[in-house]
Amino acid sequence: MNNKVGIVHSLKDGQKYMDIWPMRKELNPLFPEQRVIKATRFAIKVMPAVAAISVLTQMVFANTQAMPQAIVVALFAMSLPLQGIWWLGHRANTQLPPALASWYRELYMKIVETGFALEPIKSKPRYKELAQVLNRAFRQLDDTALERWF
């Protein structure tokens, strides 16, 4: 697969990746995804208000000289959630390093051994496939099966 994808595709993948990544404390030391997802969700909620306040305060005080700076601040505030979603989309389409790919295969085989159906294993897995397998593992495997990895 071509790793160079458009910005719109990356944003869509980022939103999907944000939904499928398991938000588990065991994964915090290993992956930055949980921190990025939390920051991005916070930015989605807060940054539109920051953008509006930065422009509206200049309008209320009739400070036309500071309006260009307020607009730049508003644009920057509005870009922060997009940057987080773009990063997640880019990360979702990145191939796993060899160590993580073998970990993905082990976890995949463990899930299949316990009798759960998964989509076919990927020869060159990406982070989004790892997220799907991790999500399934945390939902369907018991704690004793997960002890080896966490």
Swiss-Prot record:
Cellular component terms (Gene Ontology): plasma membrane
InterPro entries in alphabetical order: UPF0208
Keyword field: Cell inner membrane, Cell membrane, Membrane, Transmembrane, Transmembrane helix
Transmembrane segments: 42-62, 70-90
Organism superkingdom: Bacteria
Localization of this protein: Cell inner membrane
Pfam families the UniProt entry points to: DUF412 (PF04217)
Main subcellular localisation: membrane
Membrane topology value: Multi-pass membrane protein
Family under the similarity heading: Belongs to the UPF0208 family.
Family annotation (NCBIfam families): PRK01816.1
Protein name according to UniProt: UPF0208 membrane protein VC_1099
